[in-house]
Amino acid sequence: MNIQPILDAFPLPAKHGKLSDIDKDATEKAIETIIANPAEAAKALADKLKDPSTEGSDIQARHAMHATAIRIPVVDRSARKVYAEALAASLADKRPDRVKGFIIRQLQVCGGKEVVSAIGKFLTTGGLADDAAQALLAIKDGAVDEFRAALKKSKGDSKLRQNSLHGLAQLSDKSSTPEFIKALSDKDEDTRLLGLWGLSQVADPKTLEPFLAADKKETGYARNQSAHLGFKFAEKLSKKDASKVYKHIIETRKATTEKHLVEVAKAALN
């Protein structure tokens, strides 16, 4: 597919760096043409993308790909699936990471369950894991399995592990409870907080004991965050179980700077 005539409808930046001379009718027709040929157009657009460090402009291709990603879910659901699958397939080709990152971000807008496995592969790729995680969290359907698989592969990389823990916590994945509990004893503060957050998201009363035990060990910023996560946990529990959290806060927060936490806990008990 010769994509260039379609791209010519999209503006190039003026010398001062802003898009100018936008022909709305022309761009609308261009997007319609892309939607009418979603698979071929997606591949052709992906092939036009360049790494930002290389010479030449790909602004029109980026504009077209993003505009279509926004429009196609509304205009034609069947075409959306084909377009998303074609973009996802392009991730398997040899391309600069920053190009793949851009494509993944478009899938965040227009992708569905059909592309989660293609995106999930990048949860263990430094530099692309954040983009992949954000896309999967936007799609949701099928994302949990990708985060679980990535977590198993990222044991030696704290950042990648945190990325997957964050995804599983955000999705309130109950089956990941053992991983959240394991994270509570990690040497890294951020990892421990992700473990606490995960438990507060799942809100299983059976995990209150390890949650409160871990909370008691935290200091400084993590101690404050842990208390707030405790309150969130309590909001999802029965009155009886929630009271355990509030009593714990009252008993453990003795510093002047923690007075407000005690007041909140006492108010919740009454």
Model-inferred region functions:
Residues 94-98, 105-110, 114, 123, ...:
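Internal alpha-solenoid helical repeat scaffolds
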Residues 23, 53-57, 95-96, 124-128, ...:
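Short inter-helical turns and helix N-cap capping residues of alpha-solenoid HEAT/ARM repeat scaffolds
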Residues 27-31, 46, 62-66, 84, ...:
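Hydrophobic core positions within HEAT/HEAT-like alpha-solenoid repeats
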Residues 23-27, 42, 57-62, 100, ...:
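Residue-level detector of extended alpha-helical repeat arrays and alpha-solenoid scaffolds
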Residues 33-36, 63-71, 103-109, 135-138, ...:
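Core register positions within helices of long alpha-helical scaffolds
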Residues 1-17, 39-51, 74-92, 101, ...:
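Amphipathic alpha-helical scaffolding segments comprising HEAT/armadillo-like alpha-solenoid repeats
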Residues 20-60:
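N-terminal, post-signal-peptide region of Sec/Tat-exported proteins
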Residues 86, 127-131, 159, 163, ...:
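Beta-propeller blade termini and top-face loops
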